[in-house]
């Protein structure tokens, strides 16, 4: 049952084609694509790979109109030399990562005109993600008419959080208008919880976990029995941890102060989302790899950015712990969580009193889907590879089998 997956962002797109999807085994995609729209002002950098092989360049597109200009990339799935499919009709479903589903959607959903309209109406809450997802939905409807498309929402996993975790201490009338904490990265938080249960050899229903999705966007989730009971992101993906270019949580009084000084809303939005976090503090980059290299060279602001990132990460791990009765495992995932050993080491330093103790050799050894704790640590520390595309394909398959 070939399933095509799209994961669209404001400046990039990732796509995977799965020939088959096993519900409990992560499957290597038949085909993958990465598109970087920010590569050059007038050109998108496109790479593809087949069956987990090396990445190869795909003919660059001059001045593409975003995702809507990528028809030739998707047509290469069934046209031309080396295409993995004989015909477009072999594709049985298309899955889309949709970042914000509000309180409307608690599970993967077949995309209808009504669902599409709802995604559009929620775009102001995820302006970097919902509009590109809509572009992908509309492009593939043109290329592959009649093939079911499924929205898998990043917010869905968190929609059953207790009211005390989901609401803000604001006038209750605001909550009635939909202003509440939705949470994000739910696709990967849920995947990490299920994978942690497999690694630990224990039923998910009995586990209490903190999952750390650390990439350019960062969030934590407290998970009890497979259900999210708290998370760090809120009404938008701006709340919570310090991130690559996002500030995370700050005193709202600062924003009021800047508005009174004459800063307009658009400028404030740009600074908080694109010019803060690691980027804003270091003045160098939003990429943790660049920060770590600069620290080695003695760059003071890179070190400050790293220390701020770790301080806020540890603080929020503590906050998530308060929503649990105990902690069975701390899970690291995402680009930083999986690849930055110094971040994991600093986050777990001196946490022996909580039962957290990592093995420095295991931590430094590029771990994937494994336990990096010392043998006698009561709380296990896991590194789990983010597999959002596979999780989306799996969700599509389950939904279509139920229909």
UniProtKB/Swiss-Prot annotation:
Residue positions binding substrate: 97
UniProt keyword Cytoplasm, yes or no: yes
Cellular location(s): Cytoplasm
GO terms assigned for molecular function: acetate kinase activity; ATP binding; magnesium ion binding
Reactions mediated catalytically: acetate + ATP = acetyl phosphate + ADP
Ranges in a coiled coil: none
UniProt binding sites for ATP: 14, 213-217, 287-289, 335-339
EC number: 2.7.2.1
Record family assignment: Belongs to the acetokinase family.
Protein name: Acetate kinase
Gene for this chain: ackA
